[in-house]
Amino acid sequence: TPGWERNVSDSMLEALANKGGVLQINFGTAFLTDVNDKSNSYNPSTYIHAEVTDVADHIDRAVALVGIEHVGIGSDYDGVGDTLPNGLKDVSTYPNLIAELQNRGYSTSDIQKILGGNFARVWREVEEYARNN
């Protein structure tokens, strides 16, 4: 969401990628879309939830900016409460995101990187650094 202060800027994302890091896409609606007035508290009767396509849009944008090697998912299932996108309410619904990414032309290898491969790569690098320093 442009202008949402908790999202990283393009320059921050580029700096992260230049150091080999991975941006984890958050599933909270406020991070994905500006359809709700952020100055108001969450009201279940009026809240408009993001969609799986909004998550995929964020993935697309990050991949276009810094490449597939620097994008992952960090759902924040335990932190955003009932602001999760329609179709991504828990891990059992990941096939919805996978299907959307496939429809957008992502390969199996790319999807594996997004779903955890990139994070695992960075984790291995951190462990190796810790062992050697």
Spell out what each predicted region is.
Residues T1, A30-D34, G79-D82, A120-V122:
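Flexible loop/turn segments at secondary-structure boundaries
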Residues T1-S9, N40-H49:
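Glycine-rich tight-turn/loop motif centered on a GG-T
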Residues E5-G21, T53-E69:
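Histidine/acidic residue-rich metal-binding segments in metalloenzymes
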Residues G20-G28:
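A conserved active-site cap/scaffold subdomain adjacent to cofactor or substrate pockets
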Residues L23, D76, I111:
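Conserved, mostly hydrophobic/aromatic
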Residues N26-F27, V66-L88:
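Short acidic/histidine-rich active-site segments
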Residues V35, N43-V52, G81-L88, L101-K113:
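Outer-membrane beta-barrel pore domains
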Residues K89-N133:
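Mid-to-C-terminal alpha-helical segments outside catalytic/metal-binding sites
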